[in-house]
């Protein structure tokens, strides 16, 4: 028997019985029966057996399944020790979905796909040995964090660590295009190369001259951004990771770009096929000035990137539109057109209703809270990566005359449910920071030199979180309540503190900091001021109870850290980012990211299998009232939770808004009828802006027929 000869199995049927209540009760025990049946019928008979871990490793090396170099850093005795430690933890998957996802997507299999070569303990073992790079204490600490599901590396890292025939450890990238053919050509090549390795790519088009702009003095010669969008879409479609999955990309455009209306129109259902983009995602960067003009119901001017760069000597993206707006309007040398700000606001809302796009990056908000030197101009495919970039200059031979910096995303996630049970919260986070540091140190995207240059200078990582709704519900706390907001604030403050501590430790050990550290708010100490003078201790009795036994830094602790950072610096330019979570949240048996669940019993359509049902983690009679669907919540409560986390996160958080096509009037005081309107979305975007939210990801609309609009999650960037 092999995985190719399974025959009739019972575990899918058992799992599907969860969705059939018996006498008003959800038969959750059927999911546990499905897990047992899955191991009995699928895993155990089809796992290749070995006498010992050393025998297994010898086989995996001989058959070219594992890299030899990382294993050579450890003695056989230590490998036996850490393997035994992992076995002693008695790890068990808590749901059928968790076990199925791990063995289907992550476990190493024989070349013919017939047999499993790894268990969860084995995958954790190889991750720990790989990321610890010969440090036995760190390897044991990492194994401890991962087997207890306190830390989860992002999918590309967890999947590929230690494998001989592996993909990259990262799968999320940001590149920018400047206003010349050499940059466009090089960027398309970069998109092809990144898509080939399974990457999701964010691309800024804001610097490109608009349709009708002059080229070499010839008026009306420029084609604008839409044809370039089509080139990128075709590139992602063509370069599809050995035919396994479609490439994925998002293009960003500033709302003051003259092509903004035609840019948005490419996603409309009734768009002409010549301009319609079907698979490319859209995002917009929104300066503060747009919100001001829309609020006042005034005209807004759109400015030609070509004339802006001629006048100011920098690409359009690097100009502060809010600061320079009046100056640009008054300058006769700046080509401009005029539209009504509220008309554009309505167009954005219409498209979000129809497709879930565009993503929204509040670019001035992102830059105001950016503590490092430079300018954030865009984001990634999931809108949580916000890092400074610099433009490149490329000659006719496609060589770099000036090497700019672009971005790769080195991601991992804390599991809130389990990290809150850690015997040492701080040590756990410091260990995770070390694991992510390995990823940034060993990520070399040589096919795109600007990304490699950015990574080498910044050493950026993105530690995030998942399982917030699970944690709150299991502690009988309503998502979005004052208690939930206060908990979120303290939790992310702690992530901020401990990643700073460890980044400072690494900088001291290596005598190295990120590029331009001395120009940052960390170096002059101003970043720490609010923590030194403010009160970030738990206030309510309930939150004090939740954090009982967990160290909460005082103002003096922050002051001490400030002095250490001023002396020795930080290794990482960026440390925190909250991505959406895909498969890894199922393996961890918690709710995805920090947003609410959408269903108590989630229905997933798996390729070649059919429906699998996943009960919310910790679902029980007493927790059911606290597992309220996101579609039945006031989205302002979700925004409030994200705002509490945002204060402490140096990058962004992937914030999805969930709305029904028929909105209950009682949810929103401005509603006079149930139908969702463009005004609803405009009000919520403005609420998010006023709460200092940096980015909004999808708008997911649940329709009367049970379909979701805007729910086509990208595989390349959910971690």
Residue ranges: model-predicted function:
Residues 1-719:
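Extended catalytic cores of very large enzyme megasubunits
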């Amino acid at each position: 028997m092999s995985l190719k000869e399974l025959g009739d199995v019972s575990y899918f049927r058992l799992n599907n019985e969860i969705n059939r209540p018996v006498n008003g009760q959800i038969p959750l025990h059927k999911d546990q029966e499905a897990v047992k049946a899955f191991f009995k019928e699928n895993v155990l008979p089809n796992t290749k057996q070995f006498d010992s871990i050393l025998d297994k490793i010898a086989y995996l090396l001989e058959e070219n399944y594992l890299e030899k170099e990382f294993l050579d850093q450890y003695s056989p005795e230590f490998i036996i020790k850490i393997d035994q430690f992992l076995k002693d933890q008695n790890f068990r998957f808590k749901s059928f979905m968790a076990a199925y996802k791990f063995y289907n997507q992550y476990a190493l299999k024989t070349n013919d796909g017939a047999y499993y070569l790894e268990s969860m303990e084995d995958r954790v073992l190889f991750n720990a040995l790989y990321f610890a790079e010969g440090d036995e204490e760190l390897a044991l600490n990492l194994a401890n964090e991962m087997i207890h599901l306190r830390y989860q590396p992002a999918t590309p890292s967890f999947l590929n660590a230690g494998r001989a025939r592996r993909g990259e450890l990262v799968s999320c990238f940001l590149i920018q295009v400047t206003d010349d053919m050499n940059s466009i050509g090089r960027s398309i090549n970069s998109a092809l190369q990144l898509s080939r390795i399974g990457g999701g790519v964010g691309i800024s088009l804001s610097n490109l001259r608009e349709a009708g702009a002059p080229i070499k003095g010839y008026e009306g010669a420029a084609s604008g951004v839409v044809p370039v969008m089509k080139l990128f879409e075709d590139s992602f479609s063509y370069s599809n990771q050995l035919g396994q999955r479609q490439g994925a990309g998002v293009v960003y455009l500033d709302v003051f770009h003259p092509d903004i209306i035609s840019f948005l129109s490419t996603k409309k259902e009734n768009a002409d096929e010549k301009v319609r983009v079907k698979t490319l995602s859209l995002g917009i960067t929104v300066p503060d000035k747009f919100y001001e003009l829309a609020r006042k119901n005034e005209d807004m001017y759109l400015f030609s990137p070509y004339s802006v760069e001629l006048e100011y000597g920098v690409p359009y993206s690097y100009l502060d539109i809010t600061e320079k707006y009046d100056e640009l309007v008054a300058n006769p040398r700046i080509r401009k057109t005029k539209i009504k700000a509220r008309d554009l606001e309505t167009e954005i809302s219409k498209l979000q209703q129809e497709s879930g796009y565009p993503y929204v990056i509040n670019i001035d908000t992102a830059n105001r809270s950016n503590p490092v030197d430079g300018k954030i101009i865009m984001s990634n495919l999931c809108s949580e990566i916000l890092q400074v970039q610099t433009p490149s200059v490329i000659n006719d031979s496609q060589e770099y005359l000036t090497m700019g910096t672009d971005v790769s995303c080195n991601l991992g996630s804390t599991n809130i449910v389990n990290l809150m049970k850690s015997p040492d919260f701080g040590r756990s986070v410091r260990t995770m920071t070390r694991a992510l540091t390995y990823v940034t140190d060993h990520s070399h995207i040589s096919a795109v030199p600007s990304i490699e240059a950015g990574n080498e200078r910044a050493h950026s990582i993105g530690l995030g979180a998942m399982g917030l709704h699970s944690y709150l519900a299991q502690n009988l706390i309503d998502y979005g309540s004052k208690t939930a907001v206060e908990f979120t604030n303290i939790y992310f403050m702690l992530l901020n503190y401990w990643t700073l501590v460890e980044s400072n430790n690494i900088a001291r050990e290596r005598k190295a900091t990120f590029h331009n550290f001395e120009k940052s708010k960390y170096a002059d100490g101003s970043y720490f001021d609010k923590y030194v003078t403010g009160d970030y201790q738990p206030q309510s009795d309930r939150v004090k109870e939740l954090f009982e036994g967990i160290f909460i830094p005082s103002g003096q602790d922050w002051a001490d850290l400030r002095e250490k950072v001023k002396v020795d610096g930080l290794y990482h330019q960026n440390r925190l980012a909250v991505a959406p979570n895909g498969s890894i949240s199922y393996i961890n048996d918690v709710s995805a990211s920090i947003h609410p669940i959408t269903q108590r019993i989630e229905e997933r359509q798996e390729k070649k299998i059919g429906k699998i049902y996943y009960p919310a983690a910790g679902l029980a009679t007493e927790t059911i009232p606290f597992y309220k669907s996101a579609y039945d919540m006031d989205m302002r409560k979700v925004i409030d939770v994200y705002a509490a986390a945002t204060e402490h996160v140096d990058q962004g958080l992937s914030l999805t808004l969930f709305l029904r096509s028929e909105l209950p009037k009682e949810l929103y005081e401005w509603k006079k009828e149930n139908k969702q309107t463009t005004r609803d979305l405009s009000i919520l975007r403005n609420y998010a802006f006023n709460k200092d939210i940096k980015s909004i990801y999808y708008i997911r609309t649940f329709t009367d027929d049970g379909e979701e609009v805007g729910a086509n999650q990208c595989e390349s960037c959910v971690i």
